[in-house]
Design a protein with these regions (language model features):
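Conserved Helicase C-terminal RecA-like lobe
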Residues: 1-101, 171-172, 177-186
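SF2 helicase/translocase ATPase core recognition
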Residues: 69, 88-176
């Protein structure tokens, strides 16, 4: 519940009629990039969060593509984004878009809510970093200050450090405590 509230109040209170500070920041950043002709991949772990953004996009007349686990025609949504210049946003659920996509048309990636597993975010960002990409790709992570999202970022960093130790220093493996092993395997 804390995680959802950091994303958008409507994820907890369906009748909420306002806009969150995070959503305002996402929209403002996207609007600037859109006006400069950039294409943006927008990832969320909550389909409802993407639907909230889609509604704002519709209200502003911005064209977008949407890919979630319930998308019936995945190739059509991908083509909609990759082939149409005026479709500058691709709203993608982390689980549906984590693998098998080559979206080099995008040069910006938004992670609008952090995921517990840093590898999932890395895979999302990698959708734009593919063979054929000729532009620099910039990733933004939208984090609500003083929220559980900051704790998730710290957890991600701890997991990265443990994984790095595991991969690069075989001597350190026996030195890991039970707690460190448990954290690594979470």
């Amino acid at each position: 519940m804390l995680f959802r509230s950091a994303c958008h109040p409507q994820l907890i209170f369906p009748d909420f009629d306002g806009i969150s500070g995070k959503t305002e920041q996402i929209i403002d950043t996207f609007d600037t990039l859109r006006s400069e002709g950039h294409k943006v991949l927008i990832f969320s772990s909550f389909v409802r969060h993407l639907e909230i953004l889609a509604e704002v996009f519709r209200q502003r007349g911005w064209k977008y593509a949407l890919l979630t686990g319930s998308t019936n025609n995945r190739p059509s949504e991908i083509a909609h984004f990759t082939e149409q210049k005026d479709v500058q946003a691709f709203l993608i659920s982390l689980k549906a878009g984590g693998v098998g996509l080559n979206l080099t048309q995008a040069d910006y990636v938004f992670i609008i809510d952090p995921w517990w597993n840093p590898a999932a975010e890395s895979q999302a960002i990698a959708r734009a970093h593919r063979i054929g990409q000729d532009k620099q790709v910039i990733a933004y992570r939208f984090i609500t200050q003083n929220s559980i999202e900051e704790k998730i970022l710290q957890l991600q960093e701890d997991k990265r450090r443990l994984a790095e130790t595991f991969i690069t220093d075989s001597e350190a493996l026996p030195a890991l405590s039970n707690e460190q092993w448990a954290d690594l395997l979470k």
